[in-house]
């Protein structure tokens, strides 16, 4: 069976169980609310919530890029009679277009775009304003900027005029953006002249809701005209969405925006002036980048290496199975000797490329160069060596390699840096010169290859000449000229060691060069290959013969590396390009807990104390006995059969569903509308109700056949969803019995730092060959039959390797779910898991906090690292990279049964971090 079919079959089994449970009617809705979305069109429809939208998208998507499809959807909506007024069409068009651009994953289309309004310019012409809020950040800069272009495209189709701002409005924007940058920090803060260019030329008004407490100080009480020509005031509070769209969108992504607007015939050529200005400023980017690197330092999180500094991390291009999409590789010896501040998954802030990364161990790159207390200076390349010398290190001279992919430079729009001279570069040069599979076991072999094939010296035998001055090189050359040479013959390759007098800073020069040596009180000894290499590179050799009296070509106006190349019998490359790094956040793998952590979304106000303890509230009620009951704000559920008010969506007295009814806040009459038809006042679906808590809990315990109320049972102070819907207490009791906690949407979650992986060893993942075969793994990465736990296997891209604490979390949640199915819903248990090994092969949902589309994943192994390993395709499908952020994991059936939109708050951003839809198949195309 194909991989996707396996996932689909397992999902359908879980979904059938969840639908059976929900059909009992015990939950606020009698159906599973997480909608599976097999493709982009389905995801967009799920996010927007408009039935039939997917079919329109599919009908217009053939042969189009995402950007072209987004503009086409604007055209389809704005030229149709089906979608209401001009304002309604433009709002829907903006949201649908942005949802297409963001692949139907993030909530920015619905939460970040709060509305579209028509206004009048001073000359009486109409214009369009689009209202943004903070969640627009989740769309990314280019998509956020293109949402403005989408509205521009739509307003032209609807023959609505362009925005013509007054000078007072422009100056208000400029002040507002500077204040926002002070209180919230923009990733990109454009010059004021760029802001004025945008504001004077953008044909759509970028408007927004107030998001910050800060207010404008100078340009206050600015007036504008509404759609009817009446004056209205613009809020004096700062609008975060406005700043994000203008600065991190239009200004920062001007080049991309211009390209896409050209493609659809929109004249946004005014962006050229901003792009030209940006190009003129790139020469200053390096200095500002270094300053930015040192901003926001946190006490206790050390700076490991400064940018472009001697001894900092050496840039090495490449990728390992743990790196890419912002994850960087470090030698395990570097991680150990740097005080073990760096672990697998630790976030580091780096000066380039991008801003952050997570650390991954890579044992095939160069480790740190250190000086021991004994005086020996040497390179440490393995974890075993590092642990052996850990307590003997006097100082770390060079911290080793950082492995970076080309894609990280491209994605972050960072100019490529010159590569360090590494073994794979030398091997490529040798192969180009005609020598395949070149190896140099010692300096003599490297010398001979260099001479024969006219290629530079092997990187193992060159040193950091770019880190010393020409004067220091001249001083070192004289010291080597006077050195005592231990040699069996008068040729270069017979040198066993050289002893240099330990005076005048020679030891420090050798350290910065990273030449292995042993420092004694009076002398410094350099042995064998490195002695031969240093003598040759300083110029004391003619065709392999020693000539210590040779006159060297030393021009102090040149760099040390240039002088070496003037004298050495072979070419010596610049060895290192340096990268700065400092510790960011530590790695994380931990159950997500609200504070205090509830087992149930049942409100008890102040009755349970600060811990919101339902047990304490119950015992308090029991002690009062004659005065039972608490007053809490909750929905007015009316039993459909018995017609009496009940505490939840199901009336067990009459075995009937209950529905939420609305009541007038003024006259108290029941109504189905938001406005009372009798007195015109607002109606409400909730009120402060007197609840017999003791009876409610006793009934819940009886319903699930529990012995008594768990002492650790906790609820919440209150619920803030629209109708004040509460969760059945039975679920909370069962969670408490299994020590499981709930999040605000009814799910139980485990958070872990994102970490990429493309290949794994079965022994690493703690999974047997037999179990892997059941999951579809029958070959290693070379297509050999999988027979040994030591074979390297390519990871299927929706499979994940979870932290062991996460596996234990899944185990207890599975046991809770089985109890829930059996004791609350009257169904058969599904998981029947006894150990964490039983969780292998089961499905989970992973989700990023700025999105509302979960990804279906399968557990295939465990790790002791405090991270969540996933294929780069899965991480990217969550609209993430691995720069130190964390995502969450939920057991599939727990989410399908217990998640409800009815629990979500109605505030802006309320649907973020909620699995409204589920991507079943991650299609990397």
Q: Model-predicted segments: where are they?
A:
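Conserved structured catalytic cores and adjacent interaction surfaces
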Residues: 885
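Short hydrophobic "helix-edge" motifs at membrane interfaces and signal-peptide entry regions
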Residues: 872-875
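Conserved phosphate-coordination/catalytic loops
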Residues: 869
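Extended, Lys/Arg-rich, non-catalytic nucleic-acid recognition/anchoring regions
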Residues: 1-837, 841-855, 859-863, 877, ...
